[in-house]
Regions:
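GST-like domain detector, emphasizing the conserved glutathione-binding G-site
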Residues: 1-112
Length: 112
């Protein structure tokens, strides 16, 4: 079963959404931000050296960063390509990749 380390008020909500859409069984480990600093709790550093969320554990694979997790989950669990185009459809795949990385590069930076 997949374990998702989920930080309240963060990007890991997109991973929860994806796990639900894919119909995968998963466990959600919820962490809360420090109310004064709004930083992640120190115990997240025990999960991953970056000390941030999201992080998934799937067997012996441990992976951080929401777009990396999205790509991994699609590659591993969506072989029918219900939610993303095949790489041989290069134009559609390139557009998908653009939108996959758009939030990190363009949306969230101005919001911080």
């Amino acid at each position: 079963m997949i374990l998702l380390h989920h930080l309240r008020v963060g990007r890991s909500i997109f991973c929860v959404w994806q796990l639900e859409e894919l119909g995968l069984d998963y466990e959600l480990k919820v962490y809360h931000r420090n109310p004064e600093t709004f930083r992640a709790p120190p115990e997240l550093k025990q999960v991953h050296p970056l000390g941030k969320s999201p992080v998934i554990e799937d067997g012996d694979i441990k992976l951080a960063e929401s777009s990396a997790i999205t790509t991994y989950l699609l590659e591993r669990y969506d072989s029918e390509h219900r939610f993303w185009p095949q790489r041989k459809e290069i134009a559609a795949w390139a557009e998908f990749t653009q939108w996959l990385h758009y939030p990190e590069g363009s949306v969230f930076v101005p919001l911080i």
